[in-house]
Amino acid sequence: MNAIDAVIDSFSRLPGIGHKSAARIAYHLLKQGPADALRLAEAVSTLHEKIHPCTICGSYTEDEICSICADETRDRATICVVGFPQDVNTISSIPEYRGLFHVLGGLIAPLEGIGPDQLHISELIRRIHEGGITEVILATNPTIEGDTTALYIQKILQDLPVNITRLASGLPVGGDLEYADRLTLARSLNGRIKF
């Protein structure tokens, strides 16, 4: 395998990048010159050295505590529970949410050998017991694994003095009804709100 094929193969192993996209990236790096390629290689090579989970929420950070957990202006009574660190970036990108986060580190997926004991659920319970939390928002993906995880956490937390909510799911803004699947339509109907 030559050098270009090796780079294409490496990029195509990344999620969401197929062979054609990987080839475009490889040829773009060649066209840009060695400085850009070196900058990318250095950034990737130091990723695991510099980035680690926040000791409070589990999101990725370069510091012991991430910038969200360290921000005293955030709503400390609300915790948004997500499956993965990248979900923190997605939700924190909207100004409507100013609370804290808790990363589970995955979702319950028995077929993949992932059960509740592999997730950071006990840490969530500890954070609630430490006090000050009044609402837990379950923001796991609207998939079988995400729903299973949310239901499990809801059952575990139901006797604790917190409100447990789940993100609404339904039709996307600008979406056409004819393209919606049956489950999405059912959830949209069941979760309808007064207008």
UniProtKB/Swiss-Prot annotation:
Residues 77-172 form the Toprim domain. It holds the Pfam family Toprim_4. GO terms for biological process: DNA recombination; DNA repair. A zinc finger (C4-type) spans 54-69. One of its GO terms (molecular function) is zinc ion binding. SMART domains: TOPRIM (SM00493). SUPFAM superfamilies: Recombination protein RecR (SSF111304). Keywords: DNA damage, DNA recombination, DNA repair, Metal-binding, Zinc, Zinc-finger. PROSITE patterns: RECR (PS01300), TOPRIM (PS50880). Belongs to the RecR family. NCBIfam families: recR. May play a role in DNA repair. It seems to be involved in an RecBC-independent recombinational process of DNA repair. It may act with RecF and RecO. This is Recombination protein RecR. The gene is recR.
